[in-house]
Amino acid sequence: MRLSRIGTPKVSVTRVIPVRNVVIARRKPVRASNTDAKTWLMKEEQRRIRQKEQEMKQRLEELERFKTKVQKSYIRKEDRHLAQEIEKDLDIITDDYNLDSDVDLVFGELMQAEEQPKSLKSLPGASDASDNTDKSVELFSFPSPNLTLPEKVIHHIGPLVKHISNPENIQWGRLLLDLEKNQGFNGLSAVDVTRLIQNIPKEEKYQHMSLIHEMMFNSGISPDRYLTDLMMTAFSERSYYEPLVEALFQDYDINGWAPTDYTFGALIKVYSKGKKLDKINNLLNQMKLKYHKEPNKKIYTMVLQTCMKIDDYKKTSEVFDAMKFNSVATNPDTTAYGSMILMHVLNDNVEAALDLYDNLETEPDETILLALARGCSSRKVLINRGWDFIIEYYKRKFPLNEKLMTVMMYLTSRDGDLSLTRAIYNTIHESRFKMTESFSMNKNDGIALNVLLRGYFKYPDNHTVQSKTNDAVVALRRSTLALNHFGYHPKATPFLPVNELEEKHILPEVQAIWSYIILHYPDIVTSELVGTYLMILATRGSMADFNKAFEELTLKPVFEQVDNAVAVEEESEQSSELSDLRLTPLAIRLSSNIQIKYPRNHDIYHIALQACINNKDIELGQRIWQERGRFRKTPEFSMQPRNVKHNQDFEFARDMLKLLVNCNELNDACRLLLSTETQFNWEWTYVKPVYIMAEQLGDEYAKKVVRRVVRNKKSKWREEYLQGM
């Protein structure tokens, strides 16, 4: 044993520790058998198949829905297209917006007689085919892209397709006759016929519908609802097809179809053409009670225009109010507003027209502005407002035409601006001459001529005209006068070559213009023109001038006697006093040989009595009074409404009373008052001149007559009269 350095022996001890032999074995993965794997794979595949099937099913359903949607959309598009075509045929913007230069002629335009039905052979293009066809047309082998004829129709036409290659030269009558000879409508459906009709211009459809209807019958084609609508709208263009339109309407009840707005529109349109307001009212009631439909805006507008055609002012206002207050969908549009404003103006209710314009919810069109300006020309206090509408017309860049210039003449004539009236009238004819290089006048030119003559009658008017104070109008006036050239052609209207006329030149110029018209354009002369010319002579000419024109231009009345024999007033013998022909212009001498005479009516007698008042001619006045008494027996007077006859009689009696007072015939004035005491409402304002004359002459009897006449009336002037006694 060895000892350590420090003396301690080193002892080695060995400890035996037993070690357990631990074996950690790696766990092997459990592997599925082949059968389980196949089952799992099969289920997984089935799941994926089911998923794909579900996806495919969803896609198929989506495609089916899309297909259905496309089909419905196409059908709706077709329906909408057909509806639009029918609606186009029901367009209600008719002749009452094609105004002449004078809006007062609207009724004349609307009341024009319609043409009578024509036979098929007399229709344009209905003659047999001719071999002399245009070679350029034959070069085309297919219809124009503007035409959408059904393929079957094109096949039936065959070589005749050249007739429809140029849409501007289509002879529909000839084409349909050739089609009838070549299989007609055999093999065609109602839709094919509908598309064929849609290609025919609206204004020609009604001419060919009889032949089309016959071919449909021969081919056994039963019209569907759309084709029936289209046929109704085509036939509704003429009032004499009313029974046929009504028969087609009965097919709706027979087939169980629900009438559409277009169906009712066609019926109302044909009733409107015939001015059958009662039938329209019955149909509107049926729409509400039987079919539970409210009239739409177009139907209301057609009813509105029908009321205008028959000059039923009250009914027109009622229809317009119904449009305003029924619903938002029927609110009047510009067309309806224009119709109502025009109706107000035509019935001298300008204030109502202005109120309507102030409440206008749409932009005004040219018709509205011109109608309002024309209406304002009837009131002196509204002249400036009328010019505002003209300036608005210019700002909106509406066409500058004769219609506008004629309305401007109304304003200048009423305002007493003769210089501008003459310049505008001359500009109208100078512009027309520069465009056509010829002189011509028609009936419408008589309107502007009448306005021009009124300008002479109202000039001078001791007030400052609006065209000299309104800044915008001043510029227009200045340019018009500066560009005016009276001597643009030797055959032009014979104006004196000056813009400003002197008083002494007015009557000679009027007489020269009248002779010029009688010599060159006697066809445009009307009774209104004759009346205006006579009024100028009554106020500016001598009694001799008036008497001469009165006898030359008017005819005495024809009236029925008790024994039923017709009596004619004898024409007075021409005066033996001949005027100095050397001092009479050649045109006036020539025009005096042209016989243009119009029967005397109330207006002519009123003018004649005014001439007697101005010239204090009691003798002629008494003859006029007696002659008018015989005129009252004529059909022209007796056929008028009772209130019209009463008003005309009262107006003439007031004129006669004024003549008697002016001629100091106090006793005759009293006899007139007593003889008509119970017939007329003699208010103080009418009899005041008689009382003043009686006061001046100290005639107590005449004063007593005036008191009696006034006291027997419930006059609003009675208190004023009693206070002034």
Swiss-Prot record:
Coarse class of the protein's main subcellular location: mitochondrion
Boundaries of the annotated transit peptide in chain numbering: 1-21
Stretches assigned to coiled coil: none
Further information: Involved in mitochondrial-nuclear incompatibility, a major determinant in reproductive isolation between species, through hybrid incompatibility of Ccm1 and its interacting partner 15S rRNA between yeast species.
Function: Regulates mitochondrial small subunit maturation by controlling 15S rRNA 5'-end processing. Localizes to the 5' precursor of the 15S rRNA in a position that is subsequently occupied by mS47 in the mature yeast mtSSU. Uses structure and sequence-specific RNA recognition, binding to a single-stranded region of the precursor and specifically recognizing bases -6 to -1. The exchange of Ccm1 for mS47 is coupled to the irreversible removal of precursor rRNA that is accompanied by conformational changes of the mitoribosomal proteins uS5m and mS26.
Subunit structure: Binds to mitochondrial small subunit 15S rRNA.
Protein name, entry field: Mitochondrial 15S rRNA processing factor CCM1
Naturally occurring in which organism (per UniProt): Komagataella phaffii (strain GS115 / ATCC 20864)
